[in-house]
Amino acid sequence: MINIDGSYGEGGGQVLRTSLSLAAITGEPIRIAGIRAGRRKPGLAAQHLTAVRAAARICHGELQGDALGSTMLEFIPGGGVKAGNYIFDVSEVQQGGSAGAITLVLQTILLPLALADGDSHITLRGGTHVIFSPTVTYIERVYLPMLCRMGIKAQVKLGAWGWYPRGGGEVNLQVKGGCQLCGLNLLERGELKRVQGLAVATELPAHIPQRMANRAENLLRTAGLRVSMQALREKGVAPGAGIFLTAEYCNSLTGFGGFGRLRLSSEKVAEIACGQLLQFHETGAPVDEHLADQLLLPAVLASESSQYKVAEVSTHLTTNAAVIEKFGLGKITVNQAERVVAIASSKV
């Protein structure tokens, strides 16, 4: 059994999700102690518990410690990941519903299902656009297209918007099984081709997304970027608003966003998202700090070595690298000075 210290590094949920994914893929049983010890409320929250049970379900695994607030977990996979049709609902584990990010559940089970024999269809319910988590828009426009370059074939479709704190969103995920993963060489991003933006509001006046879109377009055009904005007013179970920007370079993709909240103007929400994008643009790097740690797992499972340059070497990145190496699947080297990540898969 592989013992994992959940308090290592940034002490967040990434340690748990990566461990669950690799345990399901390799069949290695794991014990995690100190789950999310670095967070204000340690232990398993609704989205983490849903991810735990989802990982166990797709491989008929056994669990101990799978409860809200638990800081200790044992997971014994049960004989290979099984492709199929699955439904995972974050609100089921927390009475009254939850906006727990379903994208974190998605990222936990995606690679195991992509490597399984047969195709899978997964319905996920909960929060689709939640602060401090990848949004479904980011998954659709950045994460999955980048993973497609590495051989992973998956599509996501947003069925209903789900914001914090209500949730109530739904996503349908299609995963092609039997994928053969290849490496990624991404040291240069090339020229910026375009920025695409989506400003959206549910159960709120139409002027809110339009103001976000107008402000973002003005800021990005002033900065000399080619931009195309779309403003949408959608139906939802609760009010919510946000703006989501995707920058397409010749060799890479990146995405940033901002969320509306009380006493924060639509224009300010747009300024926050644009500020993040412009700051990244100035780094010259092809990979943003969030995608940097998300690419590690497919890279270490690939049949070729990978290397890519990142905008920032975050604690999230180095923590995830340390967890992956616990499974003996390869060697990850992070050059802090050059901001280059090199992954030598054991399959090479």
From Swiss-Prot:
Keywords: ATP-binding, Cytoplasm, Ligase, Nucleotide-binding. InterPro entries: RNA3'-term_phos_cycl_insert, RNA3'_phos_cyclase_dom, RNA3'_phos_cyclase_dom_sf, RNA3'_term_phos_cyc, RNA3'_term_phos_cyc_type_1, RNA3'P_cycl/enolpyr_Trfase_a/b, RPTC_insert. GO terms for molecular function: ATP binding; RNA-3'-phosphate cyclase activity. Gene3D superfamilies: RNA 3'-terminal phosphate cyclase domain, RNA 3'-terminal phosphate cyclase, insert domain. It is found in: Cytoplasm. It catalyses: a 3'-end 3'-phospho-ribonucleotide-RNA + ATP = a 3'-end 2',3'-cyclophospho-ribonucleotide-RNA + AMP + diphosphate. The active site is at H316 (tele-amp-histidine intermediate). One of its GO terms (cellular component) is cytoplasm. GO terms for biological process: RNA processing. Its EC number is 6.5.1.4. It is an enzyme of class 6 (ligase). It comes from the Bacteria. ATP binds at Q107, H290, L291, A292, D293, Q294. Catalyzes the conversion of 3'-phosphate to a 2',3'-cyclic phosphodiester at the end of RNA. The mechanism of action of the enzyme occurs in 3 steps: (A) adenylation of the enzyme by ATP; (B) transfer of adenylate to an RNA-N3'P to produce RNA-N3'PP5'A; (C) and attack of the adjacent 2'-hydroxyl on the 3'-phosphorus in the diester linkage to produce the cyclic end product. The biological role of this enzyme is unknown but it is likely to function in some aspects of cellular RNA processing. Belongs to the RNA 3'-terminal cyclase family. Type 1 subfamily. NCBIfam families: PRK04204.1-2, RNA_3prim_cycl. This is RNA 3'-terminal phosphate cyclase.
